[in-house]
């Protein structure tokens, strides 16, 4: 198995600028900067020559994939299950109290409490149960067939959770190292159905369980 799974966060959205907890489908659109970020992502991915680009059904992820696909010459496809962590009653909230409540629950997931949730929102188990099977299917259909790298355009909180769990990335590192818009995380399939996380944005493995200064973007 030689191909890598490249998990890419979408470009900047109007909700990101407004610091709104925007998780429900279809969600906010990309800003002009977000479009530019998506195009730059595509240019950077050209040298990787991915065989497939897929995204969540959120507008921001689909737009990012569509702008990124042009330099590569692929047609992006949307898949169920790849959307952002759902925040229930906190949807569209931008107040500090809501951000802190979500982050408290999110940090508890990385500490091992996978069943906690904000009111009306998803637990980590809910997210993993819908997200991981999509990645497993892509692995079997593409990566294990020698098709090269594949790109999944998704969302910051979901990517960090899934990549940390699958790639055994320390929780402190995952919490402390948010993903900026169009940052990527790379997973490599290993024997026995597992995954190894080899890159997290600008960092390469090994990853250390130390918290860094966090981001003010709650979904990054």
What name fits each language-model region?
Residues 1-3, 85-97, 140, 144-148, ...:
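Acidic, low-complexity terminal tails and accessory targeting/binding regions
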Residues 3, 8-72, 122:
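Active-site-proximal alpha-helix that buttresses catalytic centers in soluble enzyme cores
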Residues 4-8, 146-154, 158:
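Beta-strand elements within well-structured catalytic alpha/beta cores of enzymes
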Residues 13, 158-159:
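Short active-site segment of divalent metal-dependent hydrolases/proteases
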Residues 15, 29, 71-132, 198-201, ...:
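Phosphate-handling substructures
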Residues 39-46, 128, 132-143:
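Generic structural signal for well-ordered alpha-helical scaffold segments
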Residues 55-56, 129, 153-154:
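Short beta-strand scaffold positions
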Residues 67, 161-165:
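Active-site signature of alpha/beta-hydrolase-fold catalytic machinery across serine-
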């Amino acid at each position: 198995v030689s191909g890598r799974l490249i998990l890419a966060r979408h470009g900047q959205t109007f909700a990101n600028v407004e610091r709104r907890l925007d998780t429900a489908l279809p969600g906010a659109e990309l800003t002009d900067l977000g479009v530019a970020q998506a195009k730059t992502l595509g240019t950077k991915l050209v040298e990787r020559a991915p065989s497939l680009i897929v995204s969540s059904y959120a507008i921001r992820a689909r737009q990012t994939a569509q702008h990124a696909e042009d330099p590569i010459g692929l047609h992006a496809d949307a898949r169920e299950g790849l959307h952002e962590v759902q925040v229930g009653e906190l949807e569209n909230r931008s107040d500090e109290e809501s951000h802190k409540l979500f982050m408290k629950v999110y940090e508890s997931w990385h500490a091992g409490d996978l069943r906690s949730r904000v009111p009306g929102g998803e637990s980590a188990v809910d997210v993993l149960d819908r997200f991981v099977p999509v990645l497993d299917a892509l692995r079997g259909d593409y990566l294990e067939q020698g098709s090269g790298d594949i790109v999944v355009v998704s969302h910051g909180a979901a990517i960090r959770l899934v990549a940390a769990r699958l790639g055994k990335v320390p929780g402190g590192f995952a919490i402390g190292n948010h993903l900026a818009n169009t940052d990527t995380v790379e997973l490599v399939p290993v024997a026995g159905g597992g995954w190894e996380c080899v890159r997290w944005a600008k960092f390469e493995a090994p990853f250390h369980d130390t918290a860094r200064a966090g981001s003010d973007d709650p979904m990054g």
